[in-house]
């Protein structure tokens, strides 16, 4: 069986930074370190950090006084930041810098007097954080139909921002609908999109031209991993999302001569290796890494940890 590995795949710079923040905090301050929400959406990563002394909570009320606290890569609402400050909790902010950039874009648009529209998935932690960071009501849209259902007058000055785990391709139709709907509209430069989201989706599109089956390594609650699976399916290739090798169903590969493997931005390479090993237990496997866009982006750590 020929196995093609998509490039790039797996961890993005924001995820690497977030995990390193927790690990360095544990080294510097000692366990426990409290993390609000899953640091990234991957059970393996979360369990690994738990084993090192991290404690994951959903609300700050679960954090003891004076305990070192980390905000997840998805970002948090201002109310969460204010609660942490009121309790005098020592906070390390692992919010992805590209998410913070979206927060700042939204604030600038509000300052200009524009009604803000967020393109994203309801209930996603990043969306909740972004809506809670902007000091004004935000309209959330997830589809062209929801754009058409907006009751704002056509001449309302509006601006849009997008969830970072959505690519240019994911948002293109919604943005076009917004531009057709409103006469005075602004949005971020296309260069401001999350590089990792776009690169991984483009790699899956390339992969889909070569293989009979696509396996996406990632968590069920990972937005970007689910989207990679959808892209494979949309390209007409049988595509499956799996957390690790234990979830591999041999039936998926029964008639496949070529299999493509990729991983969401929060999935570590060790899980890709685990899936390949599971395939080897089914039959002989020859692995080839496809050429793709090289990523050399690194994000700086918080000052409190940079020198540790």
Curated annotation (Swiss-Prot):
Its cofactor is [4Fe-4S] cluster. Its EC number is 1.17.7.4. Binds 1 [4Fe-4S] cluster per subunit. (2E)-4-hydroxy-3-methylbut-2-enyl diphosphate binds at residues 41, 74, 124, 164, 222-224, 266. One of its GO terms (biological process) is dimethylallyl diphosphate biosynthetic process. It catalyses: isopentenyl diphosphate + 2 oxidized [2Fe-2S]-[ferredoxin] + H2O = (2E)-4-hydroxy-3-methylbut-2-enyl diphosphate + 2 reduced [2Fe-2S]-[ferredoxin] + 2 H(+); dimethylallyl diphosphate + 2 oxidized [2Fe-2S]-[ferredoxin] + H2O = (2E)-4-hydroxy-3-methylbut-2-enyl diphosphate + 2 reduced [2Fe-2S]-[ferredoxin] + 2 H(+). Pathway: Isoprenoid biosynthesis; dimethylallyl diphosphate biosynthesis; dimethylallyl diphosphate from (2E)-4-hydroxy-3-methylbutenyl diphosphate: step 1/1; Isoprenoid biosynthesis; isopentenyl diphosphate biosynthesis via DXP pathway; isopentenyl diphosphate from 1-deoxy-D-xylulose 5-phosphate: step 6/6. Isopentenyl diphosphate binds at residues 41, 74, 124, 222-224, 266. CDD domains: lytB_ispH (cd13944). Keywords: 4Fe-4S, Iron, Iron-sulfur, Isoprene biosynthesis, Metal-binding, Oxidoreductase. GO terms for molecular function: 4 iron, 4 sulfur cluster binding; 4-hydroxy-3-methylbut-2-enyl diphosphate reductase activity; metal ion binding. GO terms for cellular component: cytosol. Dimethylallyl diphosphate binds at residues 41, 74, 124, 222-224, 266. NCBIfam families: ispH_lytB (TIGR00216), PRK01045.1-2 (NF002188), PRK01045.1-4 (NF002190). Catalyzes the conversion of 1-hydroxy-2-methyl-2-(E)-butenyl 4-diphosphate (HMBPP) into a mixture of isopentenyl diphosphate (IPP) and dimethylallyl diphosphate (DMAPP). Acts in the terminal step of the DOXP/MEP pathway for isoprenoid precursor biosynthesis. Belongs to the IspH family. This is 4-hydroxy-3-methylbut-2-enyl diphosphate reductase 2. It comes from Bradyrhizobium diazoefficiens (strain JCM 10833 / BCRC 13528 / IAM 13628 / NBRC 14792 / USDA 110).
